[in-house]
């Protein structure tokens, strides 16, 4: 279930939104911007809903701090306000809000905006994952996120045949904690670290299969797998066919052969 953090100082409004959204989402709440920031950093939700005017820390400041943190900068944020002037709307977008909804609002308006933002985020994750994994060596580095992911890919590929390589080793190799790497990879690609590493291994295996220079039994070990059955299972889940079928399809399409 997707997670949402609602930051709202009006108890009645907070309760209404929690009840309304609680059936479809895992909802967490906070009564002001500072509490909201703490809860967001604890939960790392899929979306944030925040009031604009709140005690201790208002929505503008909280949103700005969220966008400055690499671990939360990607999270979609909806700003709510009883004021609907253009100045507040512009300020909300300038500090990084993804949507601006004036109170009072209909439940349909809120839920539609939530669904749209979460769906857009999922599509962006897939596009980013496909782009960065297609041909890593050809990627033009555009951001710190690109640098981070490419560094991970480099370490993984350098250790594909290392039997002692694991997630802990990966994190240590880039001087980062497991928690940081997990959350960063999840935020950027939608995958867990384990899934991401497995995807890299499978893409390398597919490249070997297309070259047609090695047997499948050799390829699985060079790609970081220790079990033929597990390799076949993972490959079929990812590509929708077994390694042998993949080779046959490639042969039919490109006229090249591969011996098992």
Which residues does each predicted region cover?
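Two-component/phosphorelay signaling modules centered on CheY-like receiver
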Residues: 10-28, 183, 188
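Acidic, metal-coordinating helix/loop segments flanking the phosphotransfer/catalytic sites
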Residues: 29-47
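Receiver (REC) domain active-site loop signature in two-component systems and cognate sites
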Residues: 54
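C-terminal output helix
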Residues: 105-114
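Basic/polar phosphate-binding segments, predominantly the helix-turn-helix DNA-binding elements
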Residues: 167-197, 220-242
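Terminal helix-turn-helix DNA-binding modules in bacterial transcription factors
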Residues: 187-226, 249-260
